Amino acid sequence: MEIWVDADACPRVIKEILFRAAVRHEIQTTLVANQSLPVPPSRFIRTLRVAAGFDVVDNEIVKRAAAGDLVITADIPLAAEVLAKGALALNPRGELYQQATIREKLTLRDFMDTLRGSGIQTDGPPPLGQRERQEFARQLDKWLHQVQARR
């Protein structure tokens, strides 16, 4: 079981939580990005740099993620694809994407894209707060304990 991170848009504070968890639980964590990223020295943390381009990072994560892996992403289409492969998807706000509701989230995302494309301004998500960081850490810890129980 591994953790895959859609790292280009992942907040630094979430990456720091992941770094600590990777070392503490000795779980391979790979940050996939189209730019160079600083990471702490650890045999459990690595970066995978891919070419710049539309969905290149997403496609690489989909290709590499396996059933039971955890994917960290705020990208709903990416979450849908890894869920279909049997991986879990967690967004940086601590929401664990569910197979039962991912289609609804995709539809809402597409609708919001249509609104923005027609010139209607929509608000983005609020800043990442303490509550979201705690929920992310709680969900991550829950997954890590499940992995430890299987070892």
UniProtKB/Swiss-Prot annotation:
Protein family = Belongs to the UPF0178 family.
- Superkingdom of origin organism: Bacteria
Q: Which organism is it from?
A: Sodalis glossinidius (strain morsitans)
**Membrane-crossing residues?**
none
**InterPro entries on file:** UPF0178 (IPR003791)
Q: What is this protein called?
A: UPF0178 protein SG1713
